[in-house]
Structures are given as C-alpha cells and as structure tokens.
Amino acid sequence: MNKAVLVADTIFELTEQLEHFHTLHNVTYVVYYVFPDYCAAEVQYK
C-alpha cells in the first residue's frame, strides 16, 4: 500500500484533486482533515 497527502485551500479544490488522483490510482481509503485555513486528505492506494 502507498500513501499520499493532498492539500488544498478549500474542500471543493480538494475534492477535484482527489477525483483526478482516483483516475490514476486504485484508492482504498481516504481520511479528510478540515482546518480553518486549509483542507487535507490522507489517501491510501494500491
């Protein structure tokens, strides 16, 4: 398994990044982190 962290200013931008990432990799799970200034997603993929 591989892991990646995606970071964006808004949840909408993060979702777009994740959709693009998902087209390239077989994503097994995602954990979202939402902070006042930015959002992040920890992605595990094969």
Question: Could you say what each language-model-derived stretch is?
Answer:
Residues 9-33:
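A short, charged, amphipathic alpha-helix used as a generic interaction element across diverse proteins
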Residues 35-46:
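C-terminal edge-of-domain segments
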